[in-house]
């Protein structure tokens, strides 16, 4: 009995350490942004074609470099919105500062543009309504702060099919940049997920686990509706092996480090593992 208790305590201690190490905050230093729009060489033919397109469709697309600082701010917001990422805007500098970062983030902006269209109307004095869409395309480079090695180069593109027509240019830009921040934040959450463990059973049937409590909550940004995978961890020859056993969904965040979850798959196996007193880990998937 004493041996079993010691073993259980050791397993729980390993679980807390394992999850805690993986939930460390990632510090990002946002550095250099370059604006390099992809513009083809204009010929007489292409110019005439553009004019014809405007006349036929009533739409015209224009690069808007004056919004590049707004794009930068949107990216910083997105990077900071991740579960485990905090971004500091270092300005357009190349040298290191006294601050310590895990990674630097540089970016290339290849598109900041708006498309306008006009429609005839009887509700305005000039008989025309103008509407706007804003598009943006960027590539981020995550670089090791010690070696400058590029470890990831995600691309984000918001095209005209991703946004709706809006009545002012500024509102169109704001809407698109809000979407850009969300895309960047989602990328960070997938790259740097949060980890936890199942605390205890909440509800079960004869042979299947239905609901559980986990040790993730508001302190790491867990929210109602967040999906997670559940798995066990074994160490073989000094290497971790993860075995997925099910999927969970947070139904209610009940505190800084506790949430109530519904088991969506793997209920039978999860119950068997919990009945043995073994630790089950969880990881966010979105």
Q: Model-found features: residue ranges?
A:
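Sec-dependent N-terminal signal peptides
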Residues: 4-14
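A structural "domain/chain start" motif
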Residues: 18-83, 194-211, 283-286
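C-terminal/domain-edge helix-coil "capping" segments
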Residues: 20-22, 145-216, 220, 224, ...
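A short, hydrophobic beta-strand-centered structural micro-motif
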Residues: 23-34, 86-141
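Soluble non-cytosolic domains of exported or imported proteins
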Residues: 61-73, 130-133, 167-178, 219-222
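Short hydrophobic alpha-helix segments
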Residues: 89, 153-157, 248
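Short coil-to-beta-strand transition motifs
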Residues: 103, 190-194, 239-246
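Ser/Thr/Gly-rich low-complexity blocks that favor extended beta-strand/coil architectures
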Residues: 218-248
């Amino acid at each position: 009995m004493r041996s079993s208790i010691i073993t259980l305590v050791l397993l729980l201690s390993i679980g807390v350490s394992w999850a805690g190490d993986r939930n460390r905050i990632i510090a990002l230093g946002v550095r250099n942004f370059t604006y390099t729009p992809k513009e083809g060489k204009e010929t007489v033919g292409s110019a005439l074609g553009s004019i014809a397109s405007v006349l036929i469709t009533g739409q015209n697309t224009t690069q808007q470099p004056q919004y590049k600082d707004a794009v930068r701010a949107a990216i910083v917001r997105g990077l900071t919105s991740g579960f485990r990422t905090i971004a500091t805007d270092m300005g357009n500098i190349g040298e290191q500062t006294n601050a310590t970062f895990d990674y630097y983030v540089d970016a290339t902006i290849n598109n900041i543009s708006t498309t306008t269209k006009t429609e005839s109307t009887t509700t305005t004095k000039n008989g025309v309504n103008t509407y706007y869409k804003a598009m943006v395309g960027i590539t981020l480079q995550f670089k090791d702060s010690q070696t400058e090695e590029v470890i990831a180069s995600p691309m984000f593109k918001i095209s005209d099919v991703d946004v709706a027509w809006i009545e002012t240019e500024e509102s169109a830009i704001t809407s698109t940049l809000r979407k850009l921040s969300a895309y960047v934040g989602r990328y960070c959450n997938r790259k740097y997920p949060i980890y936890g463990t199942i605390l205890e059973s909440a509800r079960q049937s004869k042979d299947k686990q239905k609901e559980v409590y986990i040790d993730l909550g508001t302190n790491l940004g867990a929210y109602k509706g967040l999906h997670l995978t559940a798995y066990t961890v074994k160490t073989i020859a000094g290497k971790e092996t993860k075995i997925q056993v099910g999927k969970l969904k947070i139904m209610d965040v009940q505190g800084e480090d506790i949430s109530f979850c519904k088991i969506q798959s793997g209920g039978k196996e999860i119950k068997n593992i919990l009945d043995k007193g073994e630790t089950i880990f969880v990881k966010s998937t979105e």
